[in-house]
Amino acid sequence: MRVEVTIDKTRPLPAGAIEALTGELGKRVNRQFPDAVVHVRYAGANGLSVLGGAKTDRDLIEEILQETWESADEWFSAE
């Protein structure tokens, strides 16, 4: 399974945030889907693509992404 998260490039994140999000989201997704590969990048709009998974897998990954984003204060430091 491949998971791709796109972040709107007109709303840049702090330095190191893309790498940190990739790592943290990857850890959380791999707990449920050990074969998943996670990519996070800038693009024209925010988005989520899940390739090679069922509809229920996408729903679960959306929940994981939401939890990861909301807990950013716990795992990301812009210093």
Swiss-Prot record:
DNA repair is among the record's keywords: yes
Keywords, in A-Z order: DNA damage, DNA repair, SOS response
Keyword presence, Isomerase: no
Coiled coil residues, start to end: none
GO biological process: DNA repair; SOS response
InterPro entries (UniProt xref): DinI-like_sf, DNA_damage-inducible_DinI-like
Pfam families assigned: DinI (PF06183)
UniProt similarity note: Belongs to the DinI family.
Role, per record: Involved in SOS regulation. Inhibits RecA by preventing RecA to bind ssDNA. Can displace ssDNA from RecA. Inhibits NucA transcription.
Cited PANTHER family: DNA DAMAGE-INDUCIBLE PROTEIN I, DNA DAMAGE-INDUCIBLE PROTEIN I-RELATED
Listed name of the protein: DNA damage-inducible protein I
Native organism: Serratia marcescens
Taxonomic lineage: Bacteria, Pseudomonadati, Pseudomonadota, Gammaproteobacteria, Enterobacterales
